[in-house]
C-alpha cells in the first residue's frame, strides 16, 4: 500500500439534518475518507483530526434564534476549505458578518438555481441546476468578502463563495439524488478545492483492514458470532483473510431463522470458504425460554439474553481465544456515541455496542466500525460473498421471534418459515424482489375457516408484507400485482398444511411500523 487511506480526510459537522449521514456516504462514494462529528466539537479534536476540508451540514434549527448551534470559530481560523450546506451556509454567513432572516415562504422540494459567475463549486456544471431545497430561513446579506454564485426566484442567495479563502455555501442539498448535479458539486469541493485523492476504495479498505487486524491480534486466536447476516459475514471473511484458522466462528441456531438458513450458513462458510465453524443447535433452549411470553419487548430481551448466555458458554470452551470480533458498523458507532454523550464523535473508542457480556475479558476486533452499510456490501462482493446474500432484505435480530405474533411455538415457526419461503421465491421468479425494499410474512395467532375439497378446515392466518422505502424511516406499502398476490396466496394455502388464509398488509409507515412487532 503506497498511501494511508486515512491520510486525506474530510470532517463533517452535524447540525441535526436527516441527510447528514448521506453527506458522509457521498464523500465516501467519491473515494475520500470522512468522519461525522457533532457541531460543538472541541478545537483540539479538530486540530488532531487535521482535515483537508470541512462540511457544515443542514439542520432543523433557526440561525435567528439566540441559542441555535454555531460552527466552532476554529473552523474559520484553520485555513481549511469549508462548505456550508443549507443551515451550514446560514451559520457560515451569520458568523462571518452576513445576515440571515426568517421567511414567510418556506422553500421545500424542487427548485432551479441560476448559477452566476464562475465558482469552483459549479465547475463543469450547467448554468441552471435542478436542486432540492428544504429551508425556511435564508441569507439576505452575504459577508463582505463573498460573492453570490447562485440564486432562485425566491432565494436571492442560493449559493455564495469566497474563492480566496475557499469558503462555499449552498442553500440546497447537494447530497440528495434529487439535486441532479449534487455529486459533481461535492466532487468539485472534495477533489478540486480540498485537493484530496480517491484513496478510499473497496480494495484499499480491505487491504487496510486486513493489515490492522494482523497488527492488532498478532498470533492470538479470535472468536466471532456468525449469524449469516451481512455484517458478521463480511467480518468473518476479513478476519479469516488476516489470520486464517486462528478464527473460530460460533453459529447459534436459535430455531428462529428462515427456511434452511442454518444449513446455508454452514455450507457457505464451512464447506465453500473453509472457515472453522462451531454450530450450536439451541432451538429447544430458546423456545423454552420464550414459553408463555407474548409481549414483543419481553421476547426481544429474552432472545438477546439467551444468545449471550449460549455464546458466552461456547467462548469459554475456546481457552486460547483472546479477541472477540464484532460486526459493528459506523451508524452503530454514531448512534451509540450520541446516546452516551450527546455527540457523534467517538470513533476511536472501543466500547461494546453489541450487547455481549462486559466480563468476557476479551479485546474487541471491529473491522467495520468506520464503514456504512453500502460500503460493507461492496467489500463483501470484493471478498467473494454472493450478491444475493449481501443484498438480501433486512432480517430482524430476533428473527421469527418478532414475526410470530404473541407466544412463540415451534409449530408456528415451521409454518411461517415455509410460507415466507414461498413468498420470497415468487418475488424472485416475478423479478419483483429487488423492486421492493423489504418483504416478509407474518404469522397471526388466529384461526380462520377455510374450504379444502369437500371438507372444511379451521387453520391459521398469515399476512404478507412488502414495502418500498429509501431510508426505512418512512415507507409505502408495495403495490404488488393482484395476479402475483393471488398466486402466492394459492401456493401457501395449498402447500403449507395448517394455513387457511393469506392477507396483505397495506399499511404505510407512519402510522404503522414496517415490522409488526
Curated annotation (Swiss-Prot):
Gene label: guaA
Domain (GMPS ATP-PPase): residue spans on this chain: 200-392
Pathways involved: Purine metabolism; GMP biosynthesis; GMP from XMP (L-Gln route): step 1/1
Gene Ontology, cellular component aspect: cytosol
Assembly information from the UniProt record: Homodimer.
PROSITE patterns attached to this UniProt entry: GATASE_TYPE_1, GMPS_ATP_PPASE
Keywords, alphabetical: ATP-binding, Glutamine amidotransferase, GMP biosynthesis, Ligase, Nucleotide-binding, Purine biosynthesis
This protein's name: GMP synthase [glutamine-hydrolyzing]
E.C. code: 6.3.5.2
Annotated ranges, domain Glutamine amidotransferase type-1: 9-199
Keyword Membrane: no
One Pfam family here: NAD_synthase
Active-site positions on this chain: 86, 173, 175
Catalytic activity: XMP + L-glutamine + ATP + H2O = GMP + L-glutamate + AMP + diphosphate + 2 H(+)
Top-level taxon: Bacteria
GO molecular function: ATP binding; GMP synthase activity
Coiled-coil residue spans: none
Amino acid at each position: 500500500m503506497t498511501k494511508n487511506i486515512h491520510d486525506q480526510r474530510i470532517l463533517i459537522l452535524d447540525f441535526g439534518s436527516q441527510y447528514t449521514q448521506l453527506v458522509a456516504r457521498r464523500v465516501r462514494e467519491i473515494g475520500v475518507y470522512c468522519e461525522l462529528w457533532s457541531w460543538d466539537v472541541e478545537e483540539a479534536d479538530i486540530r488532531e483530526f487535521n482535515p483537508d476540508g470541512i462540511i457544515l451540514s443542514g439542520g432543523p434549527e433557526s440561525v435567528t434564534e439566540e441559542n441555535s448551534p454555531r460552527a466552532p470559530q476554529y473552523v474559520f481560523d484553520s485555513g481549511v476549505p469549508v462548505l456550508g450546506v443549507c443551515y451550514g451556509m446560514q451559520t457560515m454567513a451569520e458568523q462571518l458578518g452576513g445576515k440571515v432572516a426568517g421567511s414567510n415562504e418556506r422553500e421545500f422540494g424542487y427548485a432551479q438555481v441560476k448559477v452566476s459567475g464562475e465558482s469552483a463549486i459549479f465547475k463543469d456544471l450547467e448554468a441552471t441546476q435542478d436542486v432540492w431545497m428544504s429551508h425556511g430561513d435564508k441569507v439576505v446579506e452575504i459577508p463582505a468578502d463573498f460573492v453570490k454564485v447562485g440564486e432562485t426566484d425566491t432565494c436571492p442567495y442560493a449559493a455564495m463563495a469566497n474563492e480566496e479563502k475557499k469558503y462555499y455555501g449552498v442553500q440546497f442539498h447537494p447530497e440528495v439524488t434529487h439535486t441532479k448535479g449534487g455529486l459533481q458539486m461535492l466532487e468539485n469541493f472534495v477533489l478540486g478545492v480540498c485537493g484530496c485523492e480517491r484513496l478510499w476504495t473497496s480494495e484499499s479498505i480491505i487491504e487496510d483492514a486486513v493489515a490492522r487486524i494482523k497488527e492488532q491480534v498478532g498470533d492470538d486466536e479470535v472468536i466471532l458470532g456468525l449469524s449469516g447476516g451481512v455484517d458478521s459475514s463480511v467480518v468473518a471473511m476479513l478476519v479469516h483473510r488476516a489470520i486464517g484458522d486462528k478464527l473460530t466462528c460460533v453459529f447459534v441456531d436459535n430455531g428462529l431463522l428462515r427456511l434452511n438458513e442454518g444449513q446455508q450458513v454452514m455450507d457457505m462458510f464451512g464447506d465453500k470458504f473453509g472457515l472453522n465453524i462451531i454450530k450450536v443447535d439451541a432451538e429447544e433452549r430458546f423456545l423454552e425460554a420464550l414459553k408463555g411470553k407474548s409481549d414483543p419487548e419481553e421476547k426481544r430481551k429474552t432472545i438477546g439474553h439467551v444468545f449471550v448466555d449460549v455464546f458466552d458458554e461456547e467462548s469459554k470452551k475456546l481457552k486460547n481465544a483472546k479477541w472477540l470480533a464484532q460486526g459493528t458498523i459506523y451508524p452503530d458507532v454514531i448512534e451509540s456515541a450520541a446516546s452516551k454523550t450527546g455527540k457523534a464523535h467517538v470513533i476511536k473508542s472501543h466500547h461494546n455496542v453489541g450487547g455481549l457480556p462486559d466480563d468476557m475479558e476479551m479485546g474487541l476486533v471491529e473491522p467495520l466500525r468506520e464503514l456504512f452499510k453500502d460500503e460493507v456490501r461492496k467489500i463483501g462482493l470484493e471478498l467473494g460473498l454472493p450478491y444475493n446474500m449481501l443484498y438480501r432484505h433486512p432480517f430482524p435480530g430476533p428473527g421469527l421471534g418478532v414475526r410470530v405474533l404473541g407466544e412463540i411455538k415451534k409449530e408456528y415457526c415451521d409454518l411461517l418459515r415455509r410460507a415466507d419461503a414461498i413468498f420470497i421465491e415468487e418475488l424472485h421468479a416475478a423479478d419483483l424482489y429487488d423492486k421492493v425494499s423489504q418483504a416478509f410474512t407474518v404469522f397471526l395467532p388466529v384461526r380462520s375457516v377455510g374450504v379444502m375439497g369437500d371438507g372444511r378446515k379451521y387453520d391459521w392466518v398469515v399476512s404478507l408484507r412488502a414495502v418500498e422505502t429509501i431510508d426505512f424511516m418512512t415507507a409505502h406499502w408495495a403495490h404488488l400485482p393482484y395476479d402475483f398476490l393471488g398466486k402466492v396466496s394459492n401456493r401457501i394455502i395449498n402447500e403449507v398444511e395448517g394455513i387457511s388464509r393469506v392477507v396483505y398488509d397495506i399499511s404505510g409507515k407512519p402510522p404503522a411500523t414496517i415490522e409488526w412487532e
